[in-house]
């Protein structure tokens, strides 16, 4: 623990010129009291309980004397305190005072006194030297380009997406801009082009997927139509075959009936005179029918020969 060093000068008031204060002397009382109090601290490691008790007793006596009404009692208490402390000072060892400690403490106190420690440290450190609305740093405004500058930069970007240092200096001088502004504009323009190409690629990809889906749906509809047409054609063929089969069966039955009718026509005249067993009758009818057919054929041939 280091001794307390006061940087404030002690104010000495001359009480000799005022009536009633003849017993007080600034040099004999105040200066000796200050020196004795500063030297009354015990060294480190040495408890010094007797000196501490004596110091507190003397401080209590001074406070009681200052609270009293009489000024002479204050002067006597001050003189008694100085004499007692002066006697006790001879028994205490001297405290070593290093000059760099005193200098460091004084510089620290001066720095603390000169600093406005009640203000906000954030405002003092971060926002102290800027002219923002609330003391905070103002954001830098966005660079605006004229129509002519934008047109020239777009023409240059159309031919070259990247500029050399020499070409950048030429454009900067021609358009009254800085190299940094030209560089930043080209960087932003390249990013814009990249985004545009990405958007076009996404649009083309989406259109391709939609076209593939439409082609797939069209192929499926064609396949279903072909299957339906093939099924319908098979049904039509089946109905045609069935109708042909039915027509063939009807013609065969009609031919058999016609031959039977011819035989019965030829033998109709003999049915009344020949009454026999049914089987015999049918055989006779067949014979007669065949005979009638032969007669008819022969008659036709004879008629053709007569005509010729």
From Swiss-Prot:
Pfam family, one: Abdominal-A
DNA-binding region: 138-197
Described function: Sequence-specific transcription factor which is part of a developmental regulatory system that provides cells with specific positional identities on the anterior-posterior axis.
PANTHER family in the record: HOMEOBOX PROTEIN ABDOMINAL-A (PTHR45659:SF4), HOMEOBOX PROTEIN HOX (PTHR45659)
Compartmental location: Nucleus
GO biological process: anterior/posterior pattern specification; negative regulation of transcription by RNA polymerase II; regulation of DNA-templated transcription
Biased segments, Basic and acidic residues type: 207-221
Species in which this protein is naturally found: Anopheles gambiae
Protein name: Homeobox protein abdominal-A homolog
Keywords assigned: Developmental protein, DNA-binding, Homeobox, Nucleus
Protein family per UniProt: Belongs to the Antp homeobox family.
Biased amino acid composition, Gly residues: 248-269
Bias type Low complexity, positions: 223-247
Disordered: annotated span: 207-277
GO CC terms: nucleus
Chain's gene name: abd-A
GO molecular function ontology, one term from the record: DNA-binding transcription factor activity, RNA polymerase II-specific
InterPro entries in alphabetical order: Abdominal-A, Antp_homeobox, HD, HD_metazoa, Homeobox_CS, Homeodomain-like_sf
Major localisation: nucleus
């Amino acid at each position: 623990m280091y001794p307390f060093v006061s940087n404030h000068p002690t104010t000495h008031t001359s009480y000799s010129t005022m009536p009633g204060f003849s017993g007080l002397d600034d040099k004999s009382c105040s200066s000796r009291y200050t020196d004795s109090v500063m030297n009354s601290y015990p060294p480190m490691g040495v408890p010094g309980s007797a000196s501490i008790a004596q110091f507190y007793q003397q401080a209590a006596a001074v406070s009681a004397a200052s609270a009293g009404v009489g000024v002479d009692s204050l002067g006597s208490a001050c003189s008694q305190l100085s004499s007692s402390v002066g006697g006790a000072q001879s028994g205490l060892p001297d405290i070593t005072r290093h000059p760099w400690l005193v200098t460091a403490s004084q510089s620290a106190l001066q720095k603390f006194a000169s600093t406005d420690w009640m203000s906000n440290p954030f405002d003092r450190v971060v926002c102290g030297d800027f002219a923002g609305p609330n003391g905070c740093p103002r954001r830098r405004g966005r660079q605006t380009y004229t129509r002519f500058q934008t047109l020239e930069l777009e023409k240059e970007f159309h031919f070259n997406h990247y500029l050399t240092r020499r070409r950048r200096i030429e454009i900067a001088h021609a358009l009254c801009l800085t190299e940094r502004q030209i560089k930043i504009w080209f960087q932003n323009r390249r990013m814009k082009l990249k985004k545009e190409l990405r958007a076009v690629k996404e649009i083309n990809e989406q259109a391709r997927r939609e076209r593939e889906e439409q082609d797939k749906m069209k192929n499926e509809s064609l396949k279903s139509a072909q299957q339906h047409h093939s099924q319908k054609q098979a049904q039509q063929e089946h109905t045609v075959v069935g109708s042909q089969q039915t027509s063939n069966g009807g013609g065969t039955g009609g031919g058999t009936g016609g031959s039977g009718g011819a035989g019965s026509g030829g033998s109709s005249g003999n049915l009344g005179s020949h009454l026999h067993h049914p089987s015999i009758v049918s055989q006779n009818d067949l014979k007669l029918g065949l005979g009638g057919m032969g007669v008819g054929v022969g008659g036709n041939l004879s008629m053709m020969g007569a005509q010729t």
